[in-house]
UniProtKB/Swiss-Prot annotation:
Enzyme class, broadest EC rank: lyase
SS bond list: none
Similarity comment text for this entry: Belongs to the ferrochelatase family.
Protein name per the record: Ferrochelatase, mitochondrial
InterPro entries in alphabetical order: Ferrochelatase, Ferrochelatase_AS, Ferrochelatase_C, Ferrochelatase_N
Keyword Aminoacyl-tRNA synthetase: no
Gene: FeCh
Main location: mitochondrion
Gene3D superfamilies attached to this UniProt entry: 3.40.50.1400
GO cellular component, one term: mitochondrion
Listed GO MF terms: 2 iron, 2 sulfur cluster binding; ferrochelatase activity; metal ion binding
Domain of life of the source: Eukaryota
Length: 384
């Protein structure tokens, strides 16, 4: 399903070790790529889960300081087993490093006035942790830092948590006064991102026999969200829907399609239908050929490599009688996607807008006091 990428294999070992600016020049523009991350090795799984389960931006639990660590401890063996089944760890760091390196190479060519550019990786729950990367950036003393969310569609639980962690870090650490800061918080409808997803889908459609091709269900799947968060006004579901709509426009509405939600945790109501339930439901209706499209993920990780590939495309498909099911690759290092990253940043650097006004808004029913403080802090930070 996935092509062997020699460029990725050649660069991966060096990039994963933290070699991010191959020229060694002092960067003028630092680009901090924010994401949740994933454990590179199974011995990192417990701490990764512990950070997730104690992050109230990501998940809210009763007596979280006690229940969160208990859940992390209990789930560690099960999650370690899943990582072993996909090769022993998450490739998200290697992909992010490669994406950042290729993006900065292009930025140096097309935007010499803001060069040299250097990418940095800031993960929320596993090394390289965002707060440690911020210290690395400060040592490099760039003129400008762009905080670039690697979640194309914004959610308070994902993008919001990453941005709140930066606010929390500088609440107890001195903020460098000689750096200009700006934010890219959402970019889920960027034309080149849309073209990337469309091409990934075309690649998989071409593998179906021609007589079935137009009947293949394109099933977009995104990480689910608790309805409690949706009802507060989180923009995530509408932004996912916008991405789906534009991808289908790019494809020319050639196939039946739908949107489902994966990776629910716990008993409370979340967005529905669940991806596995959607597959079961369509099979009952006589639709038995599918392409799964992870519309919210820009690189491979456990939720694509295990949940989609193993649990759904392999195990579930056999169980319910699917005829043929394929999974579109995430953008990874597709040339269109590297162009998308480059264009998003280049356009941002040329603009006079340091922060999207939407980012400075809170959800209409926001109940998180940290968000109020964080938004106020970012408003001031980006006005300097």
């Amino acid at each position: 399903m996935f092509l062997h990428n020699t460029k990725f294999c050649r660069l991966a070992s060096g990039l994963a070790g933290g070699v991010r600016n191959l020229s060694g020049q002092k960067p003028k523009t630092a680009i901090l790529m924010l994401n949740m991350g994933g454990p590179t090795h199974t011995d990192q799984v417990h701490d990764y889960l512990l950070r997730i389960m104690t992050d109230r931006d990501m998940i809210q639990l009763p007596v979280q300081s006690r229940l969160g660590p208990w859940i992390a401890q209990r789930r560690t063996p099960e999650v370690q087993k899943k990582y072993k089944e996909i090769g022993g760890g998450s490739p998200i760091l290697k992909w992010t490093e490669l994406q950042g390196q290729l993006m900065c190479e292009q930025l140096d060519r097309i935007s010499p006035e803001t060069a040299p550019h250097k990418h940095y990786v800031g993960f929320r729950y596993v090394n390289p942790l965002t707060e440690n990367t911020l210290a690395e950036i400060e040592k490099d003393k760039p003129e400008r830092v762009v905080l670039f969310s690697q979640y194309p569609q914004y959610s308070c639980a994902t993008s919001g948590s990453s941005f709140n962690s930066i606010f929390t870090h500088y609440r107890s650490n001195n903020l460098p006064s000689d750096i200009k800061w700006s934010i890219i918080d959402r970019w889920g409808t960027h034309p080149l991102l849309i073209k990337t997803f469309a091409q990934r889908i075309r690649d998989e459609l071409a593998k179906f026999v021609e007589t079935k091709r137009n009947d293949v269900v394109i099933l977009f799947t995104a990480h689910s969200l608790p309805l409690k968060a949706v009802n507060r006004g989180d923009a995530y579901p509408s932004e996912i829907g916008a991405s789906v709509h534009m991808v289908m426009q790019e494809l020319g509405q050639t196939n039946p399609y739908s949107l489902a939600w994966q990776s629910k945790v716990g008993p409370l109501p979340w967005l529905a239908p669940a991806t596995d339930d959607a597959i079961k439901g369509y099979v009952k209706q006589g639709l038995k050929n599918f392409i799964l499209v992870p519309i919210a993920f820009v690189n491979e990780h456990i939720e694509t490599l295990h949940e989609l590939d193993i649990e759904y495309c392999d195990e579930l498909a056999k169980e319910v009688g699917v005829e043929e099911i394929r999974r579109a690759a995430t953008p990874n290092d597709h040339p269109l996607f590297i162009d998308a990253l480059t264009n998003v940043v280049a356009d941002h650097l040329k603009s006079q807008q340091a922060v999207n006004p939407k980012f400075l808004m809170r959800c209409p029913m926001c109940s998180n006091p940290k968000c109020r403080e964080s938004k106020s802090w970012y408003r001031q930070l980006c006005s300097n």
